[in-house]
Amino acid sequence: MKQTLLIITALILMLSCEDTQTESSDGIDAGVVINEINYNSSDSFDPDDWVEIYNSSSNTMDLGSWLLKDENDDHFFPIPSNTLLIPDQYLVLCTDTLKFTALFPDVSPYYGDLGFGLGGGSDFVRLFDSNGLLVDMVEYDDDAPWPILADGSGPTLELNHPSLDNTLGENWSASEDYGTPGAVNSVYTGDE
């Protein structure tokens, strides 16, 4: 009897650990990635800071109550409730919606105003799901191997392919001038 009880307890523990792991990795496996970052615009074309996220999964994702943060936990933007991101769709989160839409009037969907900006040299961009679990994180810099042209010259940071490890600077390139918010990246290689 004790042995049966121990086996049942062990099975319950294993199943609960598996469920926890699935929940923890749910965001990572979901395919929602930080895909483009505008952290230091040129003086002549300044929509202010913005971040593009992309749904590379085959599922529609409910991003309601997800959080965008920089390296400071006090700097966060809650994505509005019922924000659905269909497969292959982009979402732009911008610091200043008026400045952003004045220069990119055709981009949709977008949300803002973030209430904080990104560091002009280096910073974190972090995305958390509605359970507070980290979904994606990029720690960019304005030094190699990160593309230096994205630092005030006009281009943005663009991920070469959404399946690449976006924590590595060599997987990012400087965009065409002003970036491609809400659209396929100008540097998209099509290669994983």
Label each region the model flagged.
Residues C17-E192:
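Activation on beta-sandwich/Ig-like modules and their edge loops
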Residues T4-M14:
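Sec-dependent N-terminal signal peptides
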